[in-house]
């Protein structure tokens, strides 16, 4: 069905995601899930539309890296830091819920997301100030991410908020014991940077994130644990926020989320997956993010190895991340994004089917 749609755009994705959420709400006999999704979808549209004026007023404009595809130079001076309008509504919702429930899990989630939000904000702000594509140095950004992640992981592990088990199904789990700590670090820092790398084409990261948040929210519901339902509400809210932002971020983008958005989105996904023991399923849902990240690792690794062996570096892809490879192959930007969305939808369906049947 998905493959037969001639043009799968923002509206198509919203309609499909909304339909899926209505079905999910019906099956779980609770339409609050659809309600928060719709509410935050329109909040996101309203805030982004009006926030664009503020971004333009302060000249928070994107700088394009010289090493990227040449057709991206026309995107220079597109308003950026749109992640502010995505993450602040989420943080306000999370703060309200945290105050009402006084949950240590929610407190840790709030502080972790806020930490990644500030990291992304600093990176974007310095990039704009320096009129360069990079704000914080790679090492500086990694150190900040690492410190925030380690604090979150150690506190959560000490309070037994992170399970040492990686649950594959109700009857099958892998006991990682103390090794869950490096796994948790890899999940949190890895998914954050993977979303960041995916945010290279108009609407790619925002669309995929909206799809993944729906999948993660549904997977948590399938656990049947009442105390975890609040995390489903948070996921569905973020799904609505991402798709609301997508209205202005889809091709041709009027605004970019920047690291303020992408790093925070990854932190939300990783933190919630760790706190709800959903690592395995998230790894399936996030297939696009993971592939994008792996393409960079493979490209850099292969180049360094061949340079050492043959004194001349060789590349597997025309350019990494993977979406740039397809761009240089001549595939239109919107077509690449459309196909990546479709693949992500199939990955979410696969993850949910496995969750139900394993």
Curated annotation (Swiss-Prot):
InterPro entries: Glycosyl_transferase_4, PNAcMuramoyl-5peptid_Trfase, PNAcMuramoyl-5peptid_Trfase_CS. One of its GO terms (biological process) is peptidoglycan biosynthetic process. It is a multi-pass membrane protein. Pfam families: Glycos_transf_4, MraY_sig1. Its EC number is 2.7.8.13. It is found in: Cell inner membrane. GO terms for molecular function: metal ion binding; phospho-N-acetylmuramoyl-pentapeptide-transferase activity; UDP-N-acetylmuramoyl-L-alanyl-D-glutamyl-meso-2,6-diaminopimelyl-D-alanyl-D-alanine:undecaprenyl-phosphate transferase activity. It catalyses: UDP-N-acetyl-alpha-D-muramoyl-L-alanyl-gamma-D-glutamyl-meso-2,6-diaminopimeloyl-D-alanyl-D-alanine + di-trans,octa-cis-undecaprenyl phosphate = di-trans,octa-cis-undecaprenyl diphospho-N-acetyl-alpha-D-muramoyl-L-alanyl-D-glutamyl-meso-2,6-diaminopimeloyl-D-alanyl-D-alanine + UMP. Pathway: Cell wall biogenesis; peptidoglycan biosynthesis. It is an enzyme of class 2 (transferase). Its main location: membrane. GO terms for cellular component: plasma membrane. Its cofactor is Mg(2+). Keywords: Cell cycle, Cell division, Cell inner membrane, Cell membrane, Cell shape, Cell wall biogenesis/degradation, Magnesium, Membrane, Metal-binding, Peptidoglycan synthesis, Transferase, Transmembrane, Transmembrane helix. The chain crosses the membrane at residues 13-47, 81-101, 106-126, 148-168, 171-191, 201-221, 228-248, 255-275, 278-298, 336-356. It comes from the Bacteria. Belongs to the glycosyltransferase 4 family. MraY subfamily. Catalyzes the initial step of the lipid cycle reactions in the biosynthesis of the cell wall peptidoglycan: transfers peptidoglycan precursor phospho-MurNAc-pentapeptide from UDP-MurNAc-pentapeptide onto the lipid carrier undecaprenyl phosphate, yielding undecaprenyl-pyrophosphoryl-MurNAc-pentapeptide, known as lipid I. This is Phospho-N-acetylmuramoyl-pentapeptide-transferase. It comes from Prochlorococcus marinus (strain MIT 9301).
């Amino acid at each position: 069905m998905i493959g037969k749609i001639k043009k799968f755009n923002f509206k198509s994705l919203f309609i499909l995601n909304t339909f899926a959420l209505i079905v999910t709400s019906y099956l779980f006999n609770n339409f609050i899930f659809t309600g928060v999704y719709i509410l935050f979808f329109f909040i996101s549209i309203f805030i982004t539309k009006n926030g664009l004026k503020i971004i333009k007023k302060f000249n928070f404009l994107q700088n394009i890296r010289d090493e990227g595809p040449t057709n991206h130079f026309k995107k220079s001076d597109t308003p950026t830091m749109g992640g502010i309008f995505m993450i602040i509504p989420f943080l306000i919702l999370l703060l309200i819920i945290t105050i009402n429930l006084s949950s240590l899990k929610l407190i840790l989630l709030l502080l972790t997301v806020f930490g990644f939000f500030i990291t992304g904000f600093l990176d974007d702000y310095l990039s704009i100030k320096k009129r360069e594509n990079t704000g914080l140095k790679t090492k500086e950004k990694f150190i900040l991410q690492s410190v925030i992640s380690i604090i979150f992981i150690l506190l959560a592990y000490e309070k037994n908020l992170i399970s040492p088990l990686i649950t594959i199904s109700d009857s099958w789990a892998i006991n990682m014991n103390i090794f869950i700590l490096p796994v948790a670090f890899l999940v949190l820092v890895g998914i954050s940077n993977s979303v960041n790398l995916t945010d290279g084409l108009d609407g790619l990261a925002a669309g995929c994130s909206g799809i993944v948040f729906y999948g993660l929210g549904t997977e948590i519901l399938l656990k049947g644990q009442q105390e975890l339902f609040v995390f489903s509400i948070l996921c569905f809210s973020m799904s609505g926020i991402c798709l609301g932002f997508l209205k202005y971020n889809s091709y041709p983008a009027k605004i970019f989320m920047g690291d303020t958005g992408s790093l925070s989105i990854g932190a939300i996904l990783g933190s919630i997956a760790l706190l709800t023991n959903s690592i395995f399923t998230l790894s399936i849902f996030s297939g696009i993010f993971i592939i994008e990240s792996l393409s960079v690792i493979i490209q850099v690794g292969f180049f360094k190895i061949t340079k050492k062996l043959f004194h001349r570096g060789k590349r597997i892809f025309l350019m990494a991340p993977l979406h740039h490879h397809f761009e240089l192959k001549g595939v239109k930007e919107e077509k690449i994004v459309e196909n990546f969305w479709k693949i992500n939808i199939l990955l979410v369906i696969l993850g949910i089917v496995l969750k139900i049947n394993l």
